[in-house]
């Protein structure tokens, strides 16, 4: 079983299998995601990284041909049961996608929208929450004088930080990021990476990335996946400097993938 013992576990994956129809996409995955740490999933395209990430908040639930078997324990509760409230799960486990996806509304309302689904706040309290989320996402100083402008008025990097602010505004416990920098320039990427490192003070962060250097810079633990299997899961420094499996070494040295 692949576990990291340096911190308490926030998510425990046990014998997880995932299917797209008859296609067996994830095969007997076992791993523990450490609380208030950054865990990165790396591997070539088609390895199952994003599929695994999306099981953590049941993004597949709208598609009846997709199914997960096994257990995913969030603080000890199996989220794969049919009794799991999807809305409450996604309030606990937020997600930021590959491309920035601001809502077609103001910067302020992008942040407030999700909060309104779960909380009834007075305007002053909502103003405070919006400022708090934008500050956490390192975006407040750039937006405080234009909160009522469209979210689309921001640059690509700012839009992605807006999406992160939107995700944390409802105060989740886990934040999932699926290739959050793939559409961004190097300067914006650097700011997002700094933000990811800061966010782990308050959240458990899981990131999917094709960029091995990004995983090495940002994460505490890294999982290498290949063809739906978890090949190796370790402390990030150990995985990149002294991998235990030849497949891992071949991938990080560019021999395949």
UniProtKB/Swiss-Prot annotation:
Enumerate the spans annotated as ABC transporter domain.
11-252
Task: Tell me which domain of life the UniProt entry assigns to the organism this sequence originates from.
Answer: Bacteria
User: How does the protein associate with the membrane?
Assistant: Peripheral membrane protein
| Family in the record | Belongs to the ABC transporter superfamily. Phosphate importer (TC 3.A.1.7) family.
One of the Pfam families matching this protein, by short name:
ABC_tran
Q: Which GO terms describe its biological process?
A: phosphate ion transmembrane transport
| Catalytic activity as recorded in UniProt | phosphate(out) + ATP + H2O = ADP + 2 phosphate(in) + H(+)
Q: Which residues bind ATP?
A: 43-50
Name of encoding gene: pstB
Q: What class of enzyme is it?
A: translocase
Question: Could you tell me what this protein is called?
Answer: Phosphate import ATP-binding protein PstB
Q: What's the EC number here?
A: 7.3.2.1
Q: What does this protein do?
A: Part of the ABC transporter complex PstSACB involved in phosphate import. Responsible for energy coupling to the transport system.
This protein's GO cellular component annotations are: plasma membrane
Database matches in InterPro entries: AAA+_ATPase, ABC_transporter-like_ATP-bd, ABC_transporter-like_CS, P-loop_NTPase, PstB-like
> What does the record note on quaternary structure?
The complex is composed of two ATP-binding proteins (PstB), two transmembrane proteins (PstC and PstA) and a solute-binding protein (PstS).
| GO MF term set | ATP binding; ATP hydrolysis activity; ATPase-coupled phosphate ion transmembrane transporter activity
The record's Gene3D superfamilies line, in alphabetical order, gives: P-loop containing nucleotide triphosphate hydrolases (3.40.50.300)
| Organism the protein comes from | Salmonella choleraesuis (strain SC-B67)
Localisation per UniProt entry: Cell inner membrane
What are the entry keywords? ATP-binding, Cell inner membrane, Cell membrane, Membrane, Nucleotide-binding, Phosphate transport, Translocase, Transport
